[in-house]
């Protein structure tokens, strides 16, 4: 169903209620049942105890109380709630005082919940959210958000009751690294489009966004010491679509925006392969020094930096230096995948020279699992993207102490088609329906990689076939919340039969948000 059609149906339903003379809101004394309970949240909490007798009604007199450390999260929460409710919801200091309140408090949660966990209690008199850090508060707010009616996501005032589902939650993540990847190289997405995706993934407790900033088809970040990377290499995209790039100021703004949603940007410069856009921009990066044409097809494996030329490492040093200076997060992704035209000896030589460059600028290496064969520093994080349960190099890296980021392509790639007739996406790794994407475990998928070896989970979204935000949404939803749950929720609490029921209750929120999601027949959508 298109967004326009969805809104038309919704409008007819509202008009029918008015025509019938039904009240727009419940009377003050009438009990209004909450849409969801604390046990319906996605990702599933560690411990959730519903109590319908403790539902809290948000009203015009409600205030948001917080301490100094929680002020930014409290303002974020108020910004979420004000448009649909029309209430003032002032943010006030301190946790004492009468009247209904949502209380956000840092530093007083159980040590059990750690840095990202939280404790939530909803009673008839108010809401109490406690965490040990502002990260935990922010993630707890995402749970609180789901306990309100779906209409809370509306951008205009809705005349209705605002019931927060009663009960208690104690929650913390299984893995500390929960990530999504957006390919902005094959097709370029504007800063506003990236910010929209940041907002969409933040609500499911994703805490990293991996931006694939370079590939054969386009270079997307300004490098001041090599300006043609952006002004030439940034002008192309798959199929001849318009290109684009981020200035360093725009990139820094994206980093700040993501941080306001408690998400860390992890930038990727893919090398030594997937480098045609760079080599097209600067002929001196080619072994023969001759210009090459741009590429707008989707073939892979043909490009390689010239491993034997000194200028290659000046290029790498300059790019890593400038990118590190505007990236506060600890990781720089150096790619490393599908370097089919680079010999194994050259690949190792390149790694031996590049790894110290990343360390020189104070960053930690992450990259596709192909880097595992170079025996990178034990701090490096190979990202597994294979489709089988065995990879000797990755298993050896895990045995040496490297943490592994799990993104098996036949389970976690968001650009894989749902079924053969899906109008977007590819199918080289197989078809990934919602159940297929959910029904696996990162600690048992790969031989030699167990719970202690896994840093987390990432859901990559490649953009060979994606041009608009609607395209991003259609391929990411409804699968993305499942990957978020795999990364957050206890393994033993996850079952497909229970998850599909909770997932179905998310769809009214997506409709309100305008998310153009795929309505899988595996889920009975609400």
Predicted regions and their residues:
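Acidic, contiguous N-terminal accessory segments
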Residues: 2-11, 15, 28-173, 324, ...
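Flexible, acidic glycine-rich loops studded with aromatic residues
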Residues: 375, 386-526
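Hydrophobic faces of well-ordered beta-strands that scaffold small-molecule active sites
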Residues: 178-182, 209-211, 265-269, 332-334, ...
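C-terminal segment of classical bacterial N-terminal signal peptides
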Residues: 18-26
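Conserved, mostly hydrophobic/aromatic
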Residues: 64, 81, 133, 180, ...
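Active-site neighborhood of glycoside hydrolase catalytic domains
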Residues: 282-381, 385-402
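Active-site beta-loop-alpha junctions enriched in small/polar residues
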Residues: 185, 214-218, 268-274, 337-339, ...
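Feature activates predominantly on carbohydrate-active enzymes
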Residues: 113, 117-301, 313, 321-324, ...
């Amino acid at each position: 169903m298109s967004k326009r059609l969805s809104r038309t149906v919704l409008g007819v339903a509202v008009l029918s209620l008015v025509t019938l003379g039904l009240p727009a809101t419940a009377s003050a004394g009438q009990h209004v049942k909450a849409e969801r309970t604390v046990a319906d949240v996605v990702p599933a909490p560690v411990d959730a105890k519903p109590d319908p007798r403790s539902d809290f009604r948000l009203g015009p007199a409600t205030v948001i109380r917080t301490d100094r450390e929680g002020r930014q999260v409290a303002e974020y929460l108020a910004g979420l709630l004000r448009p649909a409710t029309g209430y003032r919801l002032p943010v006030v200091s301190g946790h004492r005082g009468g009247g209904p309140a949502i209380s956000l408090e840092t530093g007083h949660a159980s040590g059990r919940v750690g840095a990202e966990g939280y404790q939530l209690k909803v009673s008839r008199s108010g809401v109490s959210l406690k965490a040990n850090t502002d990260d935990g508060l922010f993630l707890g707010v995402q749970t609180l958000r789901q306990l309100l009616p779906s209409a809370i996501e509306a951008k205009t005032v809705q005349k209705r009751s605002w019931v927060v589902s009663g009960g208690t939650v104690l929650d913390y993540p299984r893995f500390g690294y929960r990530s999504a990847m957006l390919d902005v190289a094959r097709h370029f997405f504007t800063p506003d489009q990236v910010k929209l995706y940041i907002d969409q993934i933040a609500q499911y407790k994703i805490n990293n966004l991996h931006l694939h900033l370079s590939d054969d088809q386009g270079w997307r970040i300004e490098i001041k010491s090599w300006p043609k990377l952006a002004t030439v290499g940034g002008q192309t995209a798959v199929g001849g679509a318009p290109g684009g790039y981020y200035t360093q100021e725009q990139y820094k703004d994206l980093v700040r925006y993501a941080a306001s949603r408690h998400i860390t940007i992890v930038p990727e410069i893919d090398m030594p392969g997937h480098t045609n856009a760079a080599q097209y921009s600067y002929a001196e990066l080619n072994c023969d020094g001759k210009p090459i044409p741009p590429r707008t097809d989707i073939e892979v494996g043909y490009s390689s930096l010239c491993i034997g030329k000194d200028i290659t490492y000046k290029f790498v040093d300059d790019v890593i230096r400038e990118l590190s200076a505007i990236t506060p997060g600890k990781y720089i992704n150096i790619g490393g995948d599908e370097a089919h035209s680079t010999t194994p000896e050259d690949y190792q030589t390149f790694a031996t020279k590049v790894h110290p460059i990343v360390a020189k600028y104070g960053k930690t290496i992450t990259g596709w699992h192909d880097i595992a064969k170079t025996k990178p520093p034990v701090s490096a994080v190979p990202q597994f993207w294979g489709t089988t349960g065995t990879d000797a190099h990755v298993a050896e890296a895990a045995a040496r102490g490297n943490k592994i980021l799990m993104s098996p392509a036949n389970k976690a790639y968001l650009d894989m088609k749902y079924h053969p007739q899906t109008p977007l996406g590819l199918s080289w790794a197989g078809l990934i329906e919602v159940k297929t994407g959910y029904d696996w475990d990162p600690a048992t998928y790969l031989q030699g990689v167990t719970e202690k070896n896994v840093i987390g989970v990432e859901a990559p979204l490649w953009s060979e076939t994606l041009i608009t935000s609607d395209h991003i949404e259609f391929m990411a939803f409804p699968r993305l919340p499942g990957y978020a749950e795999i990364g957050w929720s206890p393994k033993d609490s996850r079952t497909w039969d229970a998850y599909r029921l909770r997932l179905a209750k998310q769809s009214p929120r997506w409709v309100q948000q305008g998310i153009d999601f795929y309505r899988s027949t595996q889920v009975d959508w609400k």
